[in-house]
């Protein structure tokens, strides 16, 4: 597939200027399931209402940074990028000039990348595998709603954003610590 440079301004973020390379997912044929179970708005509203109507309940947001980018690919993909888009210092540092073919550098994608159609489902499967030993599971008939087996913690999950209802800071920290084992997280 091809590489595309995406520039974005996000004033709510610590670093509002955002530049990233995405893969042209429209050219990738992925033969397996691509849909990711995420919470819908009614599910989120129910958790919010439950928070305000449950004694001592609190609500927080958790964001996993670079969740897709840290996920190993089940099968590798390949991408080409014009060498003219790569800064000279990077070309020199990685000795890319001899690897250039017809003006392009060819790359093997071994971890998730924005634009790949399978990035979401792979990241979600890995998250599920990593949270299960800590007692977290997705409720069977409500996509994107997760609970803990015994602790008063539940959350909605949309991509890499958690809306967490909890009772007691210790219980909230249980989820944060479980996530911190494998991810860098931000909380609000």
Where are these regions (language model features)?
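Long, low-complexity, charge-biased intrinsically disordered regions
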Residues: 1-188
């Amino acid at each position: 597939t091809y590489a595309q440079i995406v520039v974005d301004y996000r004033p709510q973020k610590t670093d509002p200027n955002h530049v990233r390379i995405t893969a042209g997912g429209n050219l990738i044929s992925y033969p397996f399931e691509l849909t990711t179970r995420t919470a819908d708005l009614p599910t989120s509203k129910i958790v919010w209402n439950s928070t305000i109507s449950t004694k001592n309940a609190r609500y927080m947001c958790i964001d996993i940074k670079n969740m897709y980018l840290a996920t190993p690919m089940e099968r590798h993909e390949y991408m080409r990028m014009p060498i003219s888009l790569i800064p000279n210092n990077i070309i020199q540092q990685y000795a890319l000039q001899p690897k250039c073919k017809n003006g392009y550098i060819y790359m093997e994608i071994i971890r998730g990348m924005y634009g790949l159609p399978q990035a979401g489902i792979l990241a979600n499967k890995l998250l599920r595998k990593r949270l299960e030993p800590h007692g977290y599971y997705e409720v069977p008939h409500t996509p994107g709603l997760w609970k803990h087996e015994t602790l008063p913690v539940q959350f909605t999950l949309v991509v890499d954003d958690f809306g967490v209802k909890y009772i007691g800071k210790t219980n909230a920290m249980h989820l944060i610590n479980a996530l911190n084992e494998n991810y860098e997280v931000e909380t609000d």
